[in-house]
Amino acid sequence: MIEVVNLTKQYNGKSVVENVSLKIPKGKITSFIGPNGAGKSTLLSMISRLLKIDKGEVYIEDKELGKWKSGELSKKLSILKQSNHINVRLTIRELVSFGRFPYSQGNLTKEDIKHVDEALEYMKLSDIQHRYLDELSGGQKQRAYIAMVIAQDTEYVLLDEPLNNLDMKHSVEIMKILRRLVDELGKTVILVIHDINFASCYSDYIVGLKDGKVVSDGNIDEIINKPVLEQIYNMSFNIEDIENNKICVYYT
């Protein structure tokens, strides 16, 4: 489990995350939702130690984040940021192999190669593994980055807006893959997501943020309801039950 205690981050004296406390369940998909500027990505970055914490603590498996050695943490937790700009031209296989760096520092062992092969197969990329990233569609490229995270083989997988710039078909594909990571491989997935209907259909737990604070957190029924969503987003919602999913209608 990941526990967040009174986490705060400020820029120029203004809090973008303020006194956030959470318990993120293990072996589940947890989605951070909320309007722009709610502090979702900042919170995710602090949990992953990419961003300095101004106040508060994060505990991973009851061990305070600052006490984890970098090598240990990179085998426990991985993060895929929203922007992944790589200046060298890589094939899919070369990218996925980077996921094994915490274990082999670039000198791949038979065990590392096995993990790379399994990640490529899992993401259905084996047949195009030697293609270059700049030759791929948006959906293929995102699958390649997720394969890299799978190869890293961490218990906790953090993703910052993994559906960014993807069409509906590829967004559904990615969310189904994340669901499989939890259900088949036992991973704990934490993601920032803007589309609340994807959050509703694929998450186990949702954290609603606004102005750097947690408005509410809980299971689907506790968050995907009219009063809570209207408080988070300050707009009108209708909730429809469609094929056992709660679908938010907010276009009118």
Where are these regions (language model features)?
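The feature captures the beta-strand-to-loop junction immediately N-terminal to the Walker
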Residues: 33-35
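Helix-to-loop junction immediately C-terminal to a conserved catalytic motif
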Residues: 48
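Conserved ABC transporter NBD signature motif
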Residues: 56-64, 73
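Conserved ABC ATPase "signature" region
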Residues: 97, 110-128, 153, 158
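Conserved ABC ATPase signature
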Residues: 132-136, 140
